[in-house]
Amino acid sequence: MATWNSRGLRGSALEELINFTNDTYLKNHLALIQKIPTPITPMKIDRETRHITLAYFDKKSTVDYIGVIQGIPVCFDAKETAVDTFPLQNIHAHQISFMSDFEQQKGIAFIILHYTARNEYYYLPYCDIIKFWERSEKGVHSFPTRRSSEIGRASCRERV
């Protein structure tokens, strides 16, 4: 079971960048995008600093962000990897399910992927994420940076 001390819960430069961008969009009346907190149950609290030092997830979260951009509903997750491949185990089944349901309601679901070693960022639309997800069920458990750059060139809606 993941805890508050887990690597995935330390915050990231990517999320800080996204939060700053979302604040700028809000101030300029371009978008309203909210960071979705992961529900937790605190187990240990440092009495001096009043910081949570150990906590457990209450339930599975959906995605990191949900909002609307000029009337278009969006949901997305922020993912980072320090290597030249993105491990699909970093995307969870409940997130795929949520993004699928979101797209069925005419929203746009995607992942913003940051390759930290290269300092490269990619937009991965749900329609491409699901292709990789289905391949992972057949044994292909990651995809390289070069595939990310190919994906970001045209959206799925443009390809249909």
Regions found by a protein language model. Give the residues of each.
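Nucleic-acid nuclease catalytic cores
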Residues: 100-130
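Mg2+/Mn2+-dependent nuclease catalytic core
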Residues: 79-98, 102-105
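Acidic-basic catalytic patches of nuclease active cores, encompassing PD-(D/E)XK
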Residues: 1-56
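Short, small-residue-biased leader/transition segments that mark boundaries at the very start
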Residues: 143-148, 158-160
